[in-house]
Amino acid sequence: MTMTDPIADFLTRLRNANSAYHDEVSLPHSKLKANIAQILKNEGYISDFRTEDARVGKSLVIQLKYGPSRERSIAGLRRVSKPGLRVYAKSTNLPRVLGGLGVAIISTSSGLLTDRQAARQGVGGEVLAYVW
């Protein structure tokens, strides 16, 4: 069966594994999901990710990050732009998540960027998700 919104599925699997205190979560691989995982790693929300080749298809394995007393690094994830309602932001009107404490993931002509990187480069694009 085809998936209508693979990014929402990615975020939901990550949210569910995080709330169940799993150490890692496995999901179908795509370049877009790997780029989102790279942003999450750079921002300190996950500890690491890797790509595994299976017989059927590639999978992306994400290792979740927790504090010393198992407090979650990811407090929340929200899909913003959906297939039925796309959300775009200009470079002058980029969203701020929790006053700068969270991060907005934006798909730009320069690739996937955080809200801070997009503002620094002066580019806008489609707002994919908020992470805090």
Swiss-Prot record:
<dbReference type="Pfam" id="PF00410">
    <property type="entry name" value="Ribosomal_S8"/>
</dbReference>
<keyword id="KW-0689">Ribosomal protein</keyword>
<keyword id="KW-0687">Ribonucleoprotein</keyword>
<keyword id="KW-0699">rRNA-binding</keyword>
<dbReference type="InterPro" id="IPR047863">
    <property type="entry name" value="Ribosomal_uS8_CS"/>
</dbReference>
<dbReference type="GO" id="GO:0006412">
    <property type="term" value="P:translation"/>
</dbReference>
<comment type="subunit">
    <text>Part of the 30S ribosomal subunit. Contacts proteins S5 and S12.</text>
</comment>
<dbReference type="GO" id="GO:0019843">
    <property type="term" value="F:rRNA binding"/>
</dbReference>
<dbReference type="GO" id="GO:0003735">
    <property type="term" value="F:structural constituent of ribosome"/>
</dbReference>
<protein>
    <recommendedName>
        <fullName>Small ribosomal subunit protein uS8</fullName>
    </recommendedName>
</protein>
<comment type="similarity">
    <text>Belongs to the universal ribosomal protein uS8 family.</text>
</comment>
<keyword id="KW-0694">RNA-binding</keyword>
<dbReference type="GO" id="GO:0005840">
    <property type="term" value="C:ribosome"/>
</dbReference>
<dbReference type="InterPro" id="IPR000630">
    <property type="entry name" value="Ribosomal_uS8"/>
</dbReference>
<dbReference type="GO" id="GO:1990904">
    <property type="term" value="C:ribonucleoprotein complex"/>
</dbReference>
<dbReference type="InterPro" id="IPR035987">
    <property type="entry name" value="Ribosomal_uS8_sf"/>
</dbReference>
<comment type="function">
    <text>One of the primary rRNA binding proteins, it binds directly to 16S rRNA central domain where it helps coordinate assembly of the platform of the 30S subunit.</text>
</comment>
